[in-house]
């Protein structure tokens, strides 16, 4: 199988294609990307027959910025007979996947696919039963086995394949299903909540998002991101010239500092988190983030970079390379991840975690 499907935000297919071509090429997995504007997915076709599986095995999914999900597939299945769509799908997967741990019947995230999504939901149950009977799926779901993907691009027309559970998105279609909290000051709160789900393993939340931590929110008004920190019982310094939502101030956990986020300097040395969603040029935001990390003003940060209209992958890559160079120059050991989240628009979200010298018993090496 030599094709890899990458799901992405509609309108960002070129960025997704540029990224996978670049990163696959650096691993000497050569091929070309098939791109259809606003399709919500890209197909990277490798020149060598087995390179599709090699790519999704060797390239860390967490290193991709513009892909929400990926999986290796075979040839396109077309003209599935309405009276029996299951048999051809099972036939394509037999001998390709043995004892997969989960089935996902998916579509691209476009308006055109909404009707198709209804069909996928109905189709999943009988298909799962047939795949279990054929030995393609285990009799129960398990995260230790490959995920089987059936990806419909039109009625009666789909790709079939698989991804590895340790190197994919754990979410259906790569999208965490989050509900907007009615008491949150703005919808931007969902960006930070999604970032926490994407960047921090669930079993580390109690340690890395602990009660009583100190956090800073730069450019906080009206408090969408501060809300997520308060919800996790942190003490938050919210920095913005604009006012904060009264509901947040009433918690007693928020200190509003009426200052410019670019000029603010923290006056305590035990800040665990700094978050930032300021509308500013990416280079200016990246330079500020580098300053915080190099000076050790926070342990972890999540921030957004607003994207230009053109050369968006190049712009993000340039800023992340600058950040890495600054950290390297000052001897700071850190882990950097970036992703265009479902709740992001013309932007990407970046997570950086400073790693200190190893201390016995601490998983984060602080």
From Swiss-Prot:
A cellular component annotation (GO) from this entry: cytoplasm
Residues binding S-adenosyl-L-methionine: 188, 221-224, 240, 260, 277
Keyword Transferase belongs to the record: yes
The protein's role, per its UniProt record: Catalyzes the 2'-O-methylation at nucleotide C2498 in 23S rRNA.
UniProt-recorded Gene Ontology molecular function terms: S-adenosylmethionine-dependent methyltransferase activity
HAMAP family assigned: 23SrRNA_methyltr_M
Keyword terms, alphabetized: Cytoplasm, Methyltransferase, rRNA processing, S-adenosyl-L-methionine, Transferase
Active site: 306
Provenance organism: Salmonella heidelberg (strain SL476)
Full protein name: Ribosomal RNA large subunit methyltransferase M
Family of this protein: Belongs to the class I-like SAM-binding methyltransferase superfamily. RNA methyltransferase RlmE family. RlmM subfamily.
